[in-house]
Regions:
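Conserved phosphate-binding/catalytic region of the ribokinase-like
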Residues: 1-7, 12-13, 26-32, 37, ...
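Glycine-rich phosphate/adenosyl-contacting loop at the front of the ribokinase-like
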Residues: 1-78, 88-89
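Short, conserved phosphate/pyrophosphate- and ester-handling motifs at nucleotide-, phospho-/glycolipid
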Residues: 68, 214, 275
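Hydrophobic beta-strand scaffold residues
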Residues: 75, 101, 183-184, 241
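A glycine-rich helix N-cap at a beta->alpha junction
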Residues: 93-110
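Conserved phosphate-binding/catalytic loop of the ribokinase/pfkB sugar-kinase fold
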Residues: 102-106, 117-163
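Conserved beta-alpha-beta core of the PfkB/ribokinase-like small-molecule kinase fold
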Residues: 152-232, 248-250
């Protein structure tokens, strides 16, 4: 019997969110809407210049896991935090969300990762990530039994940045496939895709069963400005792709079918975690045996909830929302 519906593997990060004008981004040389990796000195400098904000447990795959658990899925998560105050906050929060988190903390090394997120007046988020303890996630941290017992192992594309984590990522895919399970990957960020395009393309083509990407990410992967062209390539290379297009909704592709899913109407407050929530809704429905069109509807409902408030974790009753 499958003990988990979804097992997420990603960078365990504490988010620090604050509002910021475009001038703030320009002053610090940030590319609006992107994610940049920063060192400890830059993290201190940017943090000191940020206005009032909120701290909450984050990380892309962890956000997906929390939202999927809120939708009733049985969920686990693997990611590395330090044995420090932020690490304890992360562990408490993800356990409180109903997600199993067995990874042992890092002792005596780098601090727990944090992501400094600047939310612009138009709701766009610009992220600056200090990976800290994240980079130490390795194959020794993999829970092979959990991976083998999960319907879907969900891998966060940001793990292509730390070499040890990328190796763990590939090992997890091998374990999942050896057990006859499915592997999903989210591309995470167009800049991350550009840093590791060849590795991403090979993984998507040869090792992944399910792909999540937004318009910018899928176009970056296939080096085109044409979404339709990128979608056509994706359809030929992967069993199942869910491609999001913000207010244009999403496109769900198999080798022989295409489902267009409308975006749910909502007021955009903060786009942080929209893609994470979309993946959560989709995978929660998929592992519950729903049809693909219904998976897309759950995904759109979850994404709309995520962007309707400040912060990435759900604040409304997602089960009630998808029951609609």
């Amino acid at each position: 019997m499958t003990s988990l519906d979804i097992l997420g593997i990603g960078n365990a990060i504490v988010d620090v969110l604050a509002r910021a004008e475009d001038a703030f981004l320009a002053r610090h040389g940030m590319a609006k809407g992107g994610m940049a990796l920063i060192g400890p000195d830059d993290a201190e400098r940017i943090y000191a210049d940020m206005g009032p904000g909120i701290e909450s447990s984050g990380g892309s795959a962890a956000n997906t896991c929390a939202a999927a658990a809120a939708l009733g899925a049985k969920v686990g998560y693997l990611g590395k935090v330090a044995d420090d105050a932020l690490g304890q906050v992360f562990r408490h929060d993800i356990n409180a969300a109903g997600v199993r988190f067995p990874t042992a903390p890092l002792v005596g090394g780098a601090p727990t990762a944090r992501c400094l997120i600047l939310v612009s007046p138009d709701g766009q988020r610009t992220m600056n990530t200090f990976l800290g303890a994240c980079v130490t996630l390795g194959e020794a941290d993999l829970d092979e039994a959990a991976i083998a017992a999960a319907q879907v192992t969900y891998l966060e594309g940001y793990l292509f940045d730390p070499p040890a984590a990328q190796a763990a990522f590939r090992a997890a895919a091998r374990i999942a496939h050896a057990a006859g399970r499915r592997v999903a990957i989210t591309l995470s960020d167009p800049f991350c895709v550009e840093r590791h395009r060849d590795a991403f393309r090979a993984f998507v083509r040869d090792e992944a069963d399910i792909l999540f990407a937004n318009e910018a990410e899928i176009c970056a992967l296939y080096q085109t400005d044409n979404f339709e062209a990128a979608a056509t390539i994706a359809q030929s290379e992967i069993d199942l792709a869910a491609l999001t297009r913000s207010e244009k909704g999403s496109l769900i592709l198999t080798a022989t079918t295409a489902h267009e899913v409308a975006a749910e109407a909502t007021t955009v407050v903060d786009t942080t975690g929209a893609g994470d929530a979309y993946a959560a809704g989709f995978l929660a429905a998929l592992t519950a045996g729903r049809e693909l069109a219904e998976c897309g509807r759950w995904a759109s409902v979850a994404a709309a909830e995520a962007i309707s408030h400040f912060g990435a974790r759900p604040q409304a009753d997602l089960k009630a929302l998808v029951a609609g």
